[in-house]
Amino acid sequence: MEDIVDATKRALAQMDVTQRRRVHYHIDSSEWRSWSNPEFLLYDKGIRLDEVSGSLRDAVMEVLRACMSPEGYDKAVAAMRINGFLGELVQAPAIMNEYLYNFVLFGDEPSTTRPWGFSF
């Protein structure tokens, strides 16, 4: 769990004040359950990986890596790459690309003792 907390704190350290404000929601927020994955964004919350710096995007990806087995992480990244390929194939990278994913935090600062979570 410490690896996940540390990776998330490193991602937060990369964010500016506006991004930090945009990414944080209360632990009981209804946004926790408002997840979707169509070609277009239904719920605009958090930060979009295709709109942030490469270093912040890499830091968020490290959060995923910390939460998954190596095989699971490789599968997730492969699915993201396929999404990018499909966007190129149909010439619609604005609505389908490798990094068209949002990252959102719920709860206070990431901790090993207090409730929190994230959505990707």
Per-range role (PLM):
Residues 1-28, 34:
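Mature N-terminal segment immediately following signal peptide/propeptide cleavage
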Residues 30, 34-120:
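Acidic/His-rich structured neighborhood in mature extracellular/periplasmic domains
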